[in-house]
Amino acid sequence: MLGSPLLTFPPLDEGILVKRYKRFLADVELVSGEIVTAHCANTGPMTGVLHPGGRVRIRHAPSPKRKLAWTWEQAEAPSAQGGLCWVGINTALANSLIRAAIEAGHLKQVLGPIAAIRAEVTYGSNRRSRIDLFLTPDANCSDTRPIYLEVKNTTWIEDSLALFPDTVTERGQKHLKELIGVLPESRAVLVPCLSRHDVQAFAPGDSADPRYGELFRLALTAGVEVIPCCFGFHLDKITWEGLRPTKTTQS
């Protein structure tokens, strides 16, 4: 059901973004006036969602294994429909979101019934890469080929079109080539994790990385499946907002 909670958690702390620096760090002023430093898992340019002085949400999770007790989870950004929209910027969360969506049955119509899910399985020509999720279909599935599934957290939009990537990504280009490489013995699936509820479709970010756009279209022609999944981000939960169509070009 659209709008149903997929992940729930204790309420996040809200604050104001002071600055993001050294790629991994963000200073946030809490409601109390205290300024804390949070880990930023998104090391890219964060096009359209990085707004010093804007509202953000961070999670407090102190641990002796972590240098920082805070993690930056969400940012408030201009919405495609006007007003503001909360965006999930923690790239480390995307795989868990897609896995939860599969386990909840939200992708059954496109993937078929799934018997098992494994994470970070080695693959590729030199077996040096790791696929985000490796799916084993149910024995009763009409297509019993194993599924290699790559997840891409997507936060950049133009109008209501979600775009990935927002910068040149040689790693992302490599992932497309490796997905093509598992065909036809296996299914190859690219899942853009649309981490904001205000998008209507997905396309490759040609203006940011023209080569990625070329490889994206080559992958589609080769048989790679693209399944954009949309989510809503809230203070204490993330909701399922359904599938979105794919466009082959940004323009």
UniProtKB/Swiss-Prot annotation:
InterPro entries linked to this entry: SfsA, SfsA_C, SfsA_N
Annotated signal sequence range: none
Pfam families xrefs: SfsA, SfsA_N
Record GO terms (molecular function): DNA binding
Disulfide-bond pairs as recorded: none
Family: Belongs to the SfsA family.
Entries under HAMAP family matching the protein: SfsA
Annotated protein name in UniProt: Sugar fermentation stimulation protein homolog
Source species taxonomy: Bacteria, Bacillati, Cyanobacteriota, Cyanophyceae, Synechococcales
Gene coding for it: sfsA
